[in-house]
């Protein structure tokens, strides 16, 4: 991820080099080294790119953007804040970051175009990053909005017989990890990517829905319906998205031509993600996460009565675990240790489990989050911009939000 943050060369070539060396040195079997190519994340990105092309080429993204642009194009601050707010609101109705990003990124880019931002401009990058991060980071404070949340709930209920209520989870996390982090996101984007909107004149009176748009809306509604009900049918979001993408590519049925697919689907971005996930698989194959879980209790400075130190140690442990296991691995690694941690700190079991949220809502490197890795190629933004934003927001979160969270938890009586 250092390469991503510094923009050193073609990143996918570096990923392929690492994977090639892993095979030549027999560090792991091929199914581990190349697990990224068979992962759901890889195919989520492919399907997301195809769906995004369809939303843009049919004019549906422009149609939706026209509804919102008039309220956002008179102020750059209002534009970026509005995009972030729309992403957060989607988190309350769509329990999948992947679904939110696939739906929202093309619309946000159309809004950026309507505001006069050319591809590659500061404004276009800021809008794309606002849509990607706004749909993802603050929504960790909404109980069913992301996969790590659901893994934490499921493992806590299975192992410890407890799961949080929607309201208490929202009250504990949303004021700081949701609202205040969203404000930080807006401020950082305005600082990193200064620009001003130059609204384009309206294209003319609204046109009626044509057959291609109506067909795309129907496909999207069916896709979203399957995504929203995945707990019932147990079909992965990746295969639902791939089915939709395949349908959109079918001649006579779909809306994405072979020429558009060849020109607009960025293969190198897919290789970057597959490479990063393959490297993560190598780390897991070497059992680094297992070693971390086995020794973490002896490393931590936990002691009853030292509430602030205990809180920071637990939160930072969750954050560091995510760097090794990715975000979804945090609850899988730390939930079994919640009982001993509770005894060592004097915190309630519930409070111990809730500190995981501070960890998986703090993304330090982009490879930790599949939705972010998916969003960047979909938005056409180099990964280094997301990497830089992750590092800045992580620093603000650890130095400002973690201490404020401690005071908030204390005031609510969780500690």
Predicted regions and their residues:
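Single conserved hydrophobic/aromatic residue that forms the stacking wall/gate
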Residues: 1-8, 12
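Hydrophobic core segments of alpha-helical transmembrane domains in multi-pass membrane transport
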Residues: 5-6, 18-25, 47-52, 83-91, ...
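Juxtamembrane helix-boundary/capping and inter-helix hinge elements in multi-pass membrane proteins
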Residues: 26-28, 57-60, 70-74, 111-125, ...
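Interfacial loop-to-helix junctions that mark the boundaries of transmembrane helices
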Residues: 31-40, 164-175, 208-211, 229-240, ...
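Core transmembrane alpha-helical segments of multi-pass membrane transporters/permeases
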Residues: 34-62, 84, 88-89, 93, ...
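Structural signature of hydrophobic alpha-helical transmembrane segments
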Residues: 39-50, 100, 176-179, 236-245, ...
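Hydrophobic alpha-helical transmembrane segments of multi-pass integral membrane proteins
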Residues: 72-107, 302-345, 349-358
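Juxtamembrane and boundary regions of transmembrane helices in multi-pass small-molecule transporters
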Residues: 100, 118-151, 155-208, 218, ...
């Amino acid at each position: 991820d250092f390469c991503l943050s510094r923009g050193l060369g073609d990143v996918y070539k570096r990923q392929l080099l690492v994977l090639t060396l892993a095979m030549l040195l027999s560090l792991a079997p091929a199914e581990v080294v190349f697990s990224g190519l068979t992962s759901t994340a890889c195919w989520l990105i492919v399907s997301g790119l195809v769906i995004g092309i369809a939303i843009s080429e049919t004019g549906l993204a422009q149609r939706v953007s026209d509804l919102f642009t008039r309220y956002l194009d008179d102020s750059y601050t209002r534009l970026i804040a509005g995009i972030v707010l729309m992403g957060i609101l989607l988190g309350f109705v769509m329990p999948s970051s992947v679904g939110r990003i696939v739906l929202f990124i093309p619309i946000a880019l159309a809004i950026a175009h309507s505001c006069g931002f050319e591809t590659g401009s500061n404004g276009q990058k800021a809008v794309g990053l606002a849509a990607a991060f706004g749909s993802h980071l603050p929504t960790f404070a909404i109980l069913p909005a992301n996969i790590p949340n659901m893994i934490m709930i499921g493992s806590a209920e299975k192992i410890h017989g407890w799961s949080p209520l929607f309201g208490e989870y929202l009250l504990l996390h949303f004021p700081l990890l949701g609202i205040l982090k969203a404000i930080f996101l807006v401020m950082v984007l305005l600082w990193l990517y200064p620009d001003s909107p130059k609204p384009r004149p309206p294209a003319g009176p609204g046109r009626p829905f044509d057959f291609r748009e109506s067909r795309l809306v129907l496909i999207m509604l069916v896709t979203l319906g399957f995504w929203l009900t995945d707990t019932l049918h147990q079909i992965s979001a990746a295969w639902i998205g791939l089915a939709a993408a395949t349908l959109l590519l079918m001649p006579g049925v779909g809306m994405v031509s072979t020429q558009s697919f060849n020109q607009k689907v960025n293969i190198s971005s897919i290789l970057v993600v597959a490479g990063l996930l393959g490297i993560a698989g190598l780390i897991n194959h070497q059992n680094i996460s297992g070693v971390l879980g086995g020794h973490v209790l002896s490393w931590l400075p936990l002691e009853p009565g030292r509430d602030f130190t205990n809180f920071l140690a637990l939160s930072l442990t969750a954050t560091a675990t995510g760097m090794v296991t990715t975000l979804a691995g945090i609850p899988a690694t730390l939930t079994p240790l919640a009982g001993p941690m509770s005894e060592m700190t004097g915190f309630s079991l519930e409070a111990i489990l809730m500190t995981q949220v501070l960890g998986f809502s703090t993304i330090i490197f982009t490879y930790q989050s599949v939705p972010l890795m998916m969003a960047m190629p979909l938005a056409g933004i180099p990964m280094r911009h997301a990497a830089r934003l992750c590092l800045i927001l992580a620093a603000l979160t650890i130095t400002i939000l973690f201490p404020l969270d401690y005071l908030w938890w204390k005031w609510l009586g969780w500690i």
